[in-house]
Amino acid sequence: MYKVSILIPVYNVEKYLSKCLESILIQTYKNIEIIIINDGTTDSSLDIAELYASNYDFIHVYSYENAGISTTRNRALEKATGDYYLFVDSDDFVNPHMIEKMINEAIRTHSEIVTCGYHIEYKGLSIPVSPMRKKNMDSLSALRALSQNKGINNYPWGKLYAASCFKDVKFPDEKKGFEDTYTVFKAICNAKRVSIIPNCYYHYVKRPGSLTDHMDLVQAYEMRAAYEYQELCLHQLFPKENFYYDINFYNSDMVILYTLIFFYSRKEQPVYVPAVIDWSKINIFYRIGYIVWRFIACVKFGWSLKWQEN
């Protein structure tokens, strides 16, 4: 039976950690280890983690000074001893059958990565986000699906990875946002086959203090830079292949406009640099949404919004 390492970064999640760990402890697949990396938490999260570790010998807790999410995930990777890895954020939780279903799919299809759907948990609502249909593909097809946002996303969670996918792959410590985007596609590059299953086994908890609650333009433009980095690397790896990143650039522009509208004032004189997008690749309803958001930005900022062509 293959061993699965569940990698959990912890920082000030005392309200959520027990639910996260309990959801893992009731997994129907039992050959697991839980690696908890305490990133200098200042609340009772460490006490909670150590209490669980004292009761279960497969839970291991390691504490460090605060270094950020990338370093914390890299430390978890260094401690992992499993054949497969599963990232779970400490404020999220998972369905009881998640690991069993995903590892069975990995074995059945000889896939190094299996990704599933998820629920967004927000203010009492549970909103499913599903890839819609099951699919198995080679690495190149998976990278194309990632570039077009079709069934594969840039989140490290919600995916079961063979340990080999993270050979010479680390999360970038120097990035201050969207570090996952620099990493997940590298893991996919190391996979021979990738499977998508539509079941929503992961529960992403959107809570106060999340990135979208205090976004700034540096972070928003970092999102686009991450997609540009992906696109450049993929064109270098596969010069004869077409990777259409227009939908991702569209999404990054919508995040930038959202940030401008909700977090900036006229006196700050923010700069908006539109992405270069082939609009023929974008759904008409998305195009309308973009026009509306640009109009709102213009109304809010007037001539104080600095427009700069990319």
Annotate the PLM regions:
Residues 64-80:
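Glycine-rich, basic loop-to-helix element that forms the pyrophosphate-binding segment
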Residues 1-26:
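N-proximal low-complexity "stem/linker" segments adjacent to membrane-targeting elements
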Residues 97-129:
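Conserved donor NDP-sugar-binding/catalytic core segment of glycosyltransferases
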Residues 23, 38-47:
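A conserved acidic beta->alpha catalytic loop
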Residues 201-207, 213-241, 257-279:
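Catalytic core of nucleotide-sugar-dependent glycosyltransferases
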Residues 262-310:
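Membrane-interface aromatic/basic loop that binds lipid-linked glycans or pyrophosphate carriers
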Residues 85:
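Short aromatic/hydrophobic "clamp" motif used to bind/position activated sugar donors
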Residues 142-217:
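Conserved nucleotide-sugar donor-binding catalytic segment
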